[in-house]
Amino acid sequence: QAERKGNKEMMKKSDTFFNPPETIHEGNPQEILDRKEKVVMLPMLIMQGGLDDNVIPEIQEKFAATYRAAGGECQLEIFKNSEHEWTAVPSAEADLSHETVKQFIAKQLRTLQKKAA
């Protein structure tokens, strides 16, 4: 995505983080599921900015569908008016994202409590 858009700063960060470059595939969650590796499928919350041009929404939609197809529980929330890293900037959508996390955690705790009872 960074190369396609000519985002030199993101390309530099990717080159630094994924060194050697082929390591980008080793730990890529989508590719792990595509390879049908054995993994623990914990409940997952994905929050995506609808205007994010770093990790585009379609990538998260595909991953959520793949995760569900592999037997995992995945809640995907797309915040239509948000870009990348919007949760760190005070706004109504950031507040909603924080509430979404709280609700997701509360749901997981209720599920664990029911199993323990």
Regions found by a protein language model. Name each.
Residues 39-40, 45-48, 52:
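Short beta-strand/loop motif that positions the catalytic acidic residue
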Residues 1-35:
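Mobile cap/lid helix-loop segments that gate and shape the active-site cleft of serine hydrolases
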Residues 30-41, 58-59:
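Conserved serine/cysteine hydrolase catalytic core
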Residues 68-85:
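Catalytic histidine neighborhood in serine/cysteine hydrolases
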Residues 82-95:
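Catalytic histidine-centered segment of alpha/beta-hydrolase-like enzymes
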Residues 92-117:
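Catalytic active-site module of serine/aspartate enzymes centered on a nucleophile-bearing elbow/loop
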Residues 53-62:
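Conserved alpha/beta-hydrolase "acid-adjacent" motif
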Residues 21, 44, 73-74:
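Hydrophobic anchor at the start of a short beta-strand
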